[in-house]
């Protein structure tokens, strides 16, 4: 790249070229339900073990009696200004869906939408390199891709993985009595909105980036614990939205200890400054009827859209110590945020 191109690249702020940010770009659960309500006859394949019926993180196809193939895709608009970091975050987020099923990634294909008349191709190159870096960290190749001229920058991956069928974890198989653990703090939507509002301090920006660039590779190890009954990642629908998928799929109620939910440093300070993403309101409008009465403060935390968020684990009390030991061994703070129980009311989530 020429010196003039480098100078131009350094002055470009990618978030100014998009109307949304990261997983906050997701179509709301309510609208998505309408989109997926197909009028066509249902086609079934006995080898498709996981489809979109349970809104799980990825599709799983039975290859033989022992191995399944995992397929997923995820892409979004810039959540940070730096192109390399944007690509790395987007790729890390896409790969996470493989880990959330308990699998290991095999390869990835890039998905790129780029406003070629607004942003230099050299910037797109940096975005793709960021994606390539995340793939390298996951031990896989960025094996190809597809690009289009688009009005806003978009980047992500289609990822293929594999899973030993005995280790397959889903989001709708939790059991009453399971304890709930979360592997990353909440608050990405709040901090990235603070960035758009030019309120985010540099040190807090780096904390958010570090969290979003952390691979959820621990999921493949968590899946080998037999007492882990359900597993998913927390992304654009927020903690409450993904917890509701766990509860509704298994017909259980979550007893959530809101005070135990880990938050990114100073997330509450930015929340007090009004840094609430639009995705938070869309999330609450979509599933708020299934939640208990919440203050605006509680809504802002529970419905905050995450990008490359952590894993939500439902584990039996008998296997809880094994999970805690595994997380500690990988320098992940084991944080229990609640439990699952047989419903005693119509509420899917209650606060304790």
Curated annotation (Swiss-Prot):
Xref: CDD domains: SelD
Pfam families: AIRS, AIRS_C
Positions of the record's site feature: Important for catalytic activity: 26
Matches recorded under InterPro entries: PurM-like_C_dom (IPR010918), PurM-like_C_sf (IPR036676), PurM-like_N (IPR016188), PurM-like_N_sf (IPR036921), SelD_I (IPR023061), SPS/SelD (IPR004536)
GO BP terms, alphabetized: selenocysteine biosynthetic process
Residues reported to bind ATP: 26, 54-56, 74, 97, 145-147
Cofactor: record remark: Binds 1 Mg(2+) ion per monomer.
Claim: Metal-binding is one of the keywords in the record: yes
Residues bound to Mg(2+): 57, 97, 233
Reactions it catalyzes: hydrogenselenide + ATP + H2O = selenophosphate + AMP + phosphate + 2 H(+)
Keyword annotations from UniProtKB, A to Z: ATP-binding, Kinase, Magnesium, Metal-binding, Nucleotide-binding, Selenium, Transferase
EC number: 2.7.9.3
GO cellular component, one term: cytoplasm
Keyword set includes Transferase: yes
Cofactor: Mg(2+)
Active-site annotation: 23
A GO term for molecular function: selenide, water dikinase activity
Family, per entry: Belongs to the selenophosphate synthase 1 family. Class I subfamily.
Functional description taken from the UniProt entry: Synthesizes selenophosphate from selenide and ATP.
Subunit structure: Homodimer.
Protein name: Selenide, water dikinase
Organism: Shewanella sp. (strain MR-4)
Origin organism lineage: Bacteria, Pseudomonadati, Pseudomonadota, Gammaproteobacteria, Alteromonadales
